[in-house]
UniProtKB/Swiss-Prot annotation:
Protein name listed in UniProt: Nucleoside diphosphate kinase
Subunit structure: Homotetramer.
Keyword field contains ATP-binding: yes
Enzymatic class: transferase
Amino acid sequence: MEQTFFMIKPDGVKRGFIGEVISRIERRGFSIDRLEVRHADADILKRHYAELTDRPFFPTLVDYMTSGPVIIEVISGEEVISTWRTMMGSTNPKDALPGTIRGDFAQAPSPNQATCNIVHGSDSPESATREIAIWFNN
């Protein structure tokens, strides 16, 4: 049974999509192994987004991710990583297909604004292990 890390980002929490996102996970047959409400800080975001810290948009990303609470979860199931990523949709909301979480609910960014794409999911088993350790063994 595969596990992955996922997060409902501040825009998803603020806009009231927690129940919808969790319902989609449960309807797909995945198990929720852990769930917490957190307020992210710059330190944890630097570890989570380590490959992005030198990018010019990183401060905007930190501002967005610290703008409100996030919901962090560990979910499990058969092929959960690839299936969850498909369910989320394309990272850029304008490219996300209808029927995906981002396609149905995310908003394309304005200039100088972070991409408010509602959810995050690990992209590989290695990323899942690393992100679970960062957020739950903090």
